[in-house]
């Protein structure tokens, strides 16, 4: 049985009620991204992942769009499931982490040889790239989550 990795994001914007009453959930092995009512556990919205889209990170943008990473890329989608942008990674890489930046952009953590941290603008276009030699040959073993600190360093 697959272990589900649940990523909880307390929504910064309301969706049919106060943000603290909702939970945006995704996980490795779960075929959907879900918006749950915390009180009732009722699914209020769901986005079906495409075959092979193992979601390990999900977030709600300031505009109210849903950002998520999948094994071979990251997507930004609307509540009506329209794809705003889809960033695909090269062969022999994995994308485990997609996090929001303070400027409204996105930070991607791409596992591969070499590994890369890539910053995208709000439209999904590359604006910065950092290449890393982690001395770990298997991309799947490199890292899971990447964040940018207020001083612009990466964690």
Where are each of the predicted segments found?
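Bacterial Sec-dependent N-terminal signal peptides
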Residues: 1-20
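Secretory-pathway ectodomains
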Residues: 20-155
